[in-house]
Amino acid sequence: MAAAFDTAIIIKVMMVDALSMPKKGFRVDWSGLIDDRLDTFLEMGVLVLDDVFDHQDVLLLQKESGFIEYKAATLTQGERRQSIRGDDIRWIDEDCPIGMDYLDSIMSLAEYFNQALYAGIRRSEAHYACYPAGFGYQWHVDNPKGRDDRVISAVFYLNDDWQTTDGGEILVIDKTGKQQKLQPKANRLVIFDSNLKHQVNITHRYRFSIATWMRKDDRIL
């Protein structure tokens, strides 16, 4: 299938003036970034934002992702099959304070989508993911069969100096049927409809990211 990287919406993010930003990091003017591209996002179901956060915030996420303890990811049925999904994960919670700051920013993005699209998002969740060399994730959708609780998916990447020879791209079939092929380079946020089919190509080096979902269901305690 022909890659359609050039059709992806690549946005060079203009950060809010530093003097007007709160001391807490990960603050982005989502409305300013997306308003004039919203119709295209609705048509394609895919949005790509580059240089999203301040460099120091990205460094903090990279550091936290390197010190946490990962566990083998499983499929929806709780089964571990590395031939299908080869990443190790760590769900973000209060023990990941930098990740929680990231999630706060994602909830601001969710609030934007609620206002602009009446998306009905009520909460978000995320986990760090590490793919060792030689592994990927086969074609799938983020909503298990028969469910639609995940509304919008987002993946934030933490990999410096990523090269085309490193593999590990995310492939997304957008709403027009075209395949988006996107490198997992640091400070890139890929946003897409949670019902779109996507996969992670085999990576040839360690690949770090934060997988994120904006959901319309209530949290189950």
Regions found by a protein language model. Give the residues of each.
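N-terminal low-complexity, intrinsically disordered patches enriched in charged
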Residues: I11-V13, D54, L196
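N-terminal amphipathic/basic-hydrophobic helices that include classical n-h-c signal peptides
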Residues: M1-M15
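Non-heme Fe(II)/2-oxoglutarate
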Residues: V16-A116
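Catalytic core of non-heme Fe(II) oxygenases with the double-stranded beta-helix
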Residues: I92-I202, Y206-I210, M214-L221
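Extended interaction regions within the primary functional domain
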Residues: I9, L61-E64, I121
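Generic secretory/membrane-interface signal
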Residues: A3-D6, Q77, G134
